[in-house]
Amino acid sequence: FISCIYLQNKALIAFGMAKKTLYIFNPEHDMALASGVTNYMAPASARQMASDLALLPMWYADAGSAVLAPSAYNADFLKTKSELLSMDVALLTEPEVADGKDRKFSPWGWDPALRKRLMTLGADQAELPSADYMNILREHSHRLQAVKLLPGLRLNEYFCGESFYLNTLAECSAFVEGREVCLLKAPLSGSGKGLNWCKGIFTTFISGWCARVAASQGGVVGEPIYNKVEDFAMEFYADGRGQVVFAGYSVFHTGG
């Protein structure tokens, strides 16, 4: 359930229906939002993913829209797929961002670093979320929101799931040592990242990790481990104007 709520923050936000959309794949979004800084530099692996999969939005982009990507090795691929599948999606490079003022932006996720990047490229600031909006987004992306909402999702005895917000090292220690196994999470982190699996012992390493996370993000989220059958998430689409609809399921396939 925590993942379900958290993934709502992956929603694509529109700022006007008449304008053409520029889609941006920025998989480092969660880490950038967690850092809260405008000059965030993603790890090399995340930057490589963003480059390799820059055209990913072409598969869900609206007709007549564009995808931000380097042209050197993406143009031919996009041209071939567009002709084969009758896709009306264009490629836009970074230097071209400043050329069009009549467009809206639809990234994988908003964060202060992306906002600054687009402003540096000459994007119309009126089409970008404000700095205040970024602060609100960071607050609502915090897993503390999921901790608060989770009890309301347990509609009857067939529902389970608990999540705890731990503010101090003493609370973290008591949570870990009071359970045979449990999971600690950084309140702001990417899917599958910022996790610490614990086996009933509050080690020096775990203590140090909790201290660092709490210092930068306000606390640590603790969750019990269940004898689960399947891992999946429910994904939602938010239109930016208060409407949220169920978009589908995301099922995880792992080697475990």
Task: Identify what each model region corresponds to.
Residues 12-15, 46-62, 68-174:
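Conserved N-proximal alpha/beta basic substrate-recognition cap immediately N-terminal to
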Residues 162-163, 182-206, 233, 256:
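Glycine-rich phosphate-binding loop of ATP-grasp-fold ATP-dependent ligases
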Residues 132-142, 222-226, 235-238:
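Core catalytic machinery and nucleic-acid-binding channels of phosphodiester-processing enzymes
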Residues 227-256:
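Phosphate-binding core of ATP-grasp and ATP-grasp-like enzymes
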Residues 19, 24-25, 31-58:
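N-terminal-proximal low-complexity accessory segments that begin disordered
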Residues 156-161, 183, 198-227:
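Conserved ATP-binding module of the ATP-grasp superfamily
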